[in-house]
């Protein structure tokens, strides 16, 4: 039953189909199969039933096959069938198989003659079949009948093309012998997707139903309308035989008897019939599978590689292991601690390139957000001067002071130090938010165990909240310490002598390091948001902020400068985000009501995120550009002018202002240094230590271990699906690896002239039927066949004798010396030697003397006569 290599390769494909159909991956593997294509009533169903040896396909009028049927024939000692959608049930009665096919078709398509591309998978085990995999497709029809949809022709054509377009599918084009072959829809569709003819095998049915006196010998010998892989003829049961319950095995025996006894076919009887078709398909499928295996292996390996990382944590899963939950708990807690530390401390392993980690965000809070909050307190110049003047007046009381009181300095400094509490506590809150967010990100890997994840988040968050109180207490203590003693002997403090000589302008710029040099504070892309559409609309530029100016360029190469804006008298204000905009905007304006850029009183700069806006604001503060003051605080402006009338008071205010500015800068520097250290020590490092050393004990004491490690139903299903897919891929690769390299492939037939298929609306050069008559047309020897008007082909001699080694005579249609006294009845019909009837050397341009109405030479056959070629 077929060659040995075939028996190994086809079960391989069947195993692969089952493995991947169960996990929904079959459509991606492009497995080698044979698609059966044919028109309605072409004998397609009979061909399939002859393979199985049983009646199992639905029959009826109109369109019966409305879903593709993937039919896997498997050689087995017992005979039964099973469907993939009800795999546990074995069908031994093939009438039930037919009923199940009809029922499964109706479940998807309904009963209204609709069609569906979703296949039905049927496996038939039988001792009477060879190992084959076929797809039965709906019959080609053109005119809708009854309740069929108007576009039924296009629906069926699209479905057929979907299956036969795949390069890994062989096409079995079924055409009845009593139909003009050039009008075969099956061959036309095959030609569309397989123009080289490498995947198409022709099957001619209903040979026994041809008109009396005609045959399809020229077609079956691949001389008339040739295909690269040729044609195979079969004889199926008639409708009368089916209704009469004629046994298929008896039909196969009758088929063999037909070919052996028919004078036009018995010389090639060993190459005709259903058994030979089975063997031929096995050989072709063997070649096709061997060619597809490298690509198939590559696809499987790529899918396996993509699953490797996801399956890694499931590989050693043992549900029956009593220590499994304990091991899993220890592993999860340990992994959680490692992930938390990596996100906080940073790591070169598996770096996230899409967003900032928790540690990077905390770093921005320490060195951008917190300094920004501190600097915001320094810009309220008028309020500070008013407070200093009030302090000096109140200290002097009714007396007129001659000297600047140092008590006013201490009072103002202590008041400024108290203001540090709010930004410091806000910094702690921001860090806590990032820590809790980091904890939630790390526990996402515990989603397999919902209770464990919930408990871990609760315990760690509770601990962070406990550390929050201690951290805030320590920070408030630091501020109280700064407030308790004003150290005027600090090395960085300017003292009274220097303070009297400082001006406000110099004081503003002393916070900028290396003020004699041009220091670049920040570079980056910003969008100028308020340029009118008439002038080109919003544009993105490369901005460079220095200690003295803000410049923008066309690109980051900084070659083409667009503008340079000095920072004098500039301030920052917030701009409300637009309704349809996803940009975050802030504005720069001049306090003296001058245009900042061209005719713009302010330029609106847009960033992609609020974090970028805060970062740019902090950079502008370093350059001495402060945020705009609220208008509500200017209500006491009239009183401010009262103190400006006294020159002595003005000098005293200026002196204390410089002293306060110097000392507050010292405190800010100290706080900026101590805040990150305090938070790291009391909160972040303690949290890391708690996770590593105490979290496991808290988990054990909080709940039962079994309840903690209870898997979610979704995760269990996901794990099972992934493991099943992973093992199916590995099994498929192992099966492919076991294929013997000694399997021999059959060479591909040489190409033929199949241009007759190009004209889809025309007819064949000559009809495929060859009449057999007792009357000889005039002008030709009766038993000699001339070349057909089709493509001139060299015949394939089957059983030809050596008596035809002499060269032919070009002027004659055939060798005349083979006849005795020109008597065509002097030989019995030894048909196997008849292919030599066409002289191989006749030039293609010699016209045939055949009458136009006769497609081939008539021949009278009498079995009792001696051989014509004796």
Swiss-Prot record:
Lineage: Eukaryota, Metazoa, Chordata, Craniata, Vertebrata
Tissues where this protein is expressed: Expressed in most tissues during embryonic development, including the peripheral nervous system although no expression is evident in skeletal muscle or heart.
Subcellular location: Cytoplasm, Cytoskeleton; Cytoplasmic vesicle, Clathrin-coated vesicle; Cell projection, Uropodium; Endosome
Name of encoding gene: Dnm2
Listed GO CC annotations: anchoring junction; cell junction; centriole; centrosome; clathrin-coated pit; clathrin-coated vesicle; endosome; microtubule
Organism: Mus musculus
Name under which the protein is recorded: Dynamin-2
Keywords assigned by UniProt, alphabetized: Acetylation, Cell junction, Cell projection, Coated pit, Cytoplasm, Cytoplasmic vesicle, Cytoskeleton, Endocytosis, Endosome, GTP-binding, Hydrolase, Membrane, Microtubule, Motor protein, Nucleotide-binding, Phagocytosis, Phosphoprotein, Synapse, Synaptosome
Record PTM Phosphotyrosine, positions in chain: 231, 597
Record SMART domains: DYNc (SM00053), GED (SM00302), PH (SM00233)
Residue segments, region G2 motif: 64-66
């Amino acid at each position: 039953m077929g060659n040995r290599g075939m028996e190994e390769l086809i079960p391989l494909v069947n195993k692969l189909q089952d493995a991947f159909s169960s996990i929904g991956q079959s459509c991606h593997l492009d497995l080698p199969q044979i698609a059966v294509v044919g028109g309605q009533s072409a004998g397609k169903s009979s061909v399939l039933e002859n393979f199985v040896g049983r009646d199992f396909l639905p029959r009826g009028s109109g369109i019966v096959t409305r879903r593709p049927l993937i039919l896997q024939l498997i050689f087995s000692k017992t005979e039964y069938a099973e469907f993939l959608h009800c795999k546990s049930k074995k069908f031994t009665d093939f009438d039930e198989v037919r009923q199940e096919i009809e029922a499964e078709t109706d479940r998807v398509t309904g009963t209204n003659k609709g069609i569906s591309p979703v296949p039905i998978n049927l496996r038939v085990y039988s001792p009477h079949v060879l190992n084959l995999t076929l797809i039965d497709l709906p019959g080609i029809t053109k005119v809708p009948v009854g309740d069929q949809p108007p576009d039924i022709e296009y629906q069926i054509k699209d479905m057929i093309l979907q299956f036969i377009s795949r390069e890994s599918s062989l096409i079995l084009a079924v055409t009845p012998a009593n139909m003009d072959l050039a009008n075969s829809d099956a061959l036309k569709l095959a030609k569309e997707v397989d123009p080289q003819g490498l995947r198409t095998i022709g099957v001619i049915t209903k040979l026994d139903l041809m008109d009396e006196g005609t045959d399809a010998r020229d077609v079956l010998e691949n001389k008339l309308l040739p295909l690269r892989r040729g044609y195979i003829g079969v004889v199926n049961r008639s409708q009368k035989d089916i209704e009469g319950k004629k046994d298929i095995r008896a039909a196969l025996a009758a088929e063999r008897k037909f070919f052996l006894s028919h004078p036009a076919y018995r010389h090639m009887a060993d190459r005709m019939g259903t058994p030979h078709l089975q063997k031929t398909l096995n050989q072709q499928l063997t070649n096709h599978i061997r060619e597809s295996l490298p690509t198939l292996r590559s696809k499987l390996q790529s899918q396996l590689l993509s699953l490797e990382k996801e399956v890694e944590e499931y590989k050693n899963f043992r549900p029956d292991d009593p220590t499994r939950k304990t091991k899993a708990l220890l592993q999860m807690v340990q992994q959680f601690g490692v992930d938390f530390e990596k996100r906080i401390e940073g790591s070169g392993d598996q770096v996230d390139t899409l967003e900032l980690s928790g540690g990077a965000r905390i770093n921005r809070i320490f060195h951008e957000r917190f300094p920004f909050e501190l600097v915001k307190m320094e810009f309220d110049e008028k309020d500070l001067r008013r407070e200093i003047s009030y302090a000096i007046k109140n200290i002097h009381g009714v007396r007129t002071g001659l000297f600047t009181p140092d008590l006013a300095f201490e009072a103002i400094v202590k008041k400024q130090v108290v203001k540090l509490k709010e930004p410091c506590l806000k910094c702690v809150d921001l860090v806590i938010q990032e820590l809790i967010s980091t904890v939630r990100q790390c526990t996402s890997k515990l989603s397999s165990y919902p209770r464990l994840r919930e408990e871990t988040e609760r315990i760690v968050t509770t601990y962070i909240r406990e550390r929050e109180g201690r951290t805030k207490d320590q920070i408030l203590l630091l501020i109280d310490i700064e407030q308790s003693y004003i150290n005027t002997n600090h090395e960085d403090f300017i003292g009274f002598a220097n303070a009297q000589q400082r001006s406000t302008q110099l004081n503003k710029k002393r916070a900028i390091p290396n003020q004699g040099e041009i220091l670049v504070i920040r570079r980056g892309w910003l969008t100028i948001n308020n340029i009118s559409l008439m002038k080109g609309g919003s544009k993105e530029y490369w901005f460079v902020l220095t200690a003295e100016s803000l410049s923008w360029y066309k690109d980051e190469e900084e070659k083409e400068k667009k503008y340079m804006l000095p920072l004098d008298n500039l301030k920052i204000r917030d701009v409300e985000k637009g309704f349809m905009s996803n940009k975050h905007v802030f504005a720069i304006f001049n306090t003296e009501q001058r245009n900042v850029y061209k005719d713009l009183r302010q330029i609106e700069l847009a960033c992609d995120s609020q974090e970028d806006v805060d970062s740019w604001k902090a950079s502008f503060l370093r350059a001495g550009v402060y945020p705009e003051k609220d208008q509500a605080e200017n209500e006491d402006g009239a009183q401010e002018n009262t103190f400006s009338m006294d020159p002595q008071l003005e000098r005293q205010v200026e002196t204390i202002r410089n002293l306060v500015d110097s000392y507050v800068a010292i405190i800010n520097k100290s706080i900026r240094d101590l805040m990150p250290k305090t938070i790291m020590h009391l909160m972040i490092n303690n949290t890391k230590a708690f996770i590593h050393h105490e979290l496991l004990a808290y988990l054990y004491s909080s709940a039962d271990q079994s309840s903690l490690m209870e898997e979610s139903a979704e995760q269990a299903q996901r794990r099972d699906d992934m493991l099943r897919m992973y093992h199916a891929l590995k099994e498929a690769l192992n099966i492919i690896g076991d294929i013997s390299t000694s399997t021999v492939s059959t060479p591909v037939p040489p190409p033929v002239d199949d241009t007759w298929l190009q004209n889809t609306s025309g007819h064949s050069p000559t009809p495929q039927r060859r009449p057999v008559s007792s009357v000889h047309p005039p002008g030709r020897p009766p038993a000699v066949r001339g070349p057909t008007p089709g493509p001139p082909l060299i015949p394939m001699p089957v059983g030809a004798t050596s008596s035809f080694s002499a060269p032919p005579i070009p002027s004659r249609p055939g060798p005349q010396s083979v006849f005795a006294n020109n008597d065509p009845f002097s030989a019995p019909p030894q048909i196997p030697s008849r292919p030599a009837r066409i002289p191989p050397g006749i030039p293609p341009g010699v016209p045939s003397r055949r009458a136009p109405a006769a497609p081939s030479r008539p021949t009278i056959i009498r079995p009792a006569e001696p051989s014509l070629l004796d």
